[in-house]
Amino acid sequence: MGNGLNAGRKLLENRKKFRWSDRDYKRRVLQLKRKSDPLEGAPQAKGIAIEKVGIEAKQPNSAIRKCVKVQLIKNGRQITAFAVGDGAINYIDEHDEVTVEGIGGRMGRSKGDIPGVRYKVVAVNGISLKELVKGRKEKTVR
């Protein structure tokens, strides 16, 4: 491949061609993250709590992290969301409407020692889970 005075166009075309080998470039240009994202690019989503699940923490920690399986209203996809706070799982019942958001891990992935959980519960039936756990607010009976 030439590097001469008139080789600019050829160099540019080659760069364009070889950029497709870069995983991050490909994902960004084809918007693959948004297409595969259960929240469809939105910061939060509402869903129905299907069941409570306990997920074992990764080594070297030993705990059962309390999570909830949630079926999203907008597209019917199922995700697992972490219930943040001491005893927070007790405020979430099956068939409750929960609001979920990303858990804040690196590159949109899971955080800490909870394997495969990328979302956290923010609100239950429109009331902040944090407020419920602190006892400032009561859960509404629907």
UniProtKB/Swiss-Prot annotation:
CDD domains: Ribosomal_S23 (cd03367). It comes from the Archaea. Pfam families: Ribosom_S12_S23. GO terms for cellular component: small ribosomal subunit. One of its GO terms (molecular function) is rRNA binding. InterPro entries: NA-bd_OB-fold, Ribosomal_uS12, Ribosomal_uS12_arc, Ribosomal_uS12_euk/arc. Keywords: Ribonucleoprotein, Ribosomal protein, RNA-binding, rRNA-binding. Belongs to the universal ribosomal protein uS12 family. Part of the 30S ribosomal subunit. This is Small ribosomal subunit protein uS12. The lineage of its organism: Archaea, Methanobacteriati, Thermoplasmatota, Thermoplasmata, Thermoplasmatales. The gene is rps12.
